[in-house]
Curated annotation (Swiss-Prot):
Example GO BP: translation
Gene3D superfamilies xrefs: 3.30.70.60
Low complexity bias: start-end ranges: 109-119
GO cellular component terms listed in the entry, alphabetical order: cytoplasm; ribonucleoprotein complex; ribosome
Protein name in the entry: Small ribosomal subunit protein bS6
UniProt-annotated stretches for the region Disordered: 97-119
C-alpha cells in the first residue's frame, strides 16, 4: 500500500551548488528507480542550525515529498547515513495529504480577533 512521506535532510554547507544538485539528483534517482511517485523537491538553501552538527553551524536544507510503499525508506536512509554529504535526515509518514487542502489552507487569510477590548 502506498503512503505519503516527507523527508528533510541537511547537506554540508561547504558543498558547491553543483555538488548540492548532484546529491539531490542521486537521491531523486534512487526514489524513482524504486517506484516512488509524486516526487516533489524543495531546496531551502543554506540556513543556520539550531545546534552545531559535526562542528558546523550552517547546513543546506532539502525537502522531499513522495508517495511510495515503505520498502524505499530504509535503503534511502542507509544511503544517506553512509554518504559524506548528508549531516542529518528525518523521514516522516504523513497521515493523509491532499494538495487541494494544502492550497486552501495557504490561500485563506488568517482571521484576526481582538485580543482585548476597551472597558
Amino acid at each position: 500500500m502506498s503512503q505519503h512521506y516527507e523527508m528533510i535532510f541537511i547537506l554540508r554547507p561547504d558543498l558547491s551548488e553543483e555538488q548540492v544538485n548532484q546529491a539531490v539528483a542521486k537521491y531523486q534517482e534512487f526514489l524513482t528507480e524504486n517506484n516512488a511517485t509524486d516526487l516533489q523537491t524543495k531546496i531551502w538553501g543554506k540556513r543556520r542550525l539550531a545546534y552545531p552538527i559535526q562542528k558546523k553551524v550552517d547546513g543546506i536544507y532539502v525537502q522531499f515529498n513522495y508517495q511510495a510503499d515503505g520498502s524505499q525508506v530504509a535503503p534511502l536512509e542507509r544511503m544517506m547515513r553512509l554518504g559524506e554529504d548528508v549531516m542529518r535526515y528525518l523521514t516522516i509518514k504523513l497521515d493523509h495529504v491532499s494538495s487541494e487542502t494544502a492550497e486552501e489552507e495557504e490561500s485563506e487569510p488568517a482571521q484576526s480577533e481582538p485580543v482585548a477590548s476597551e472597558a
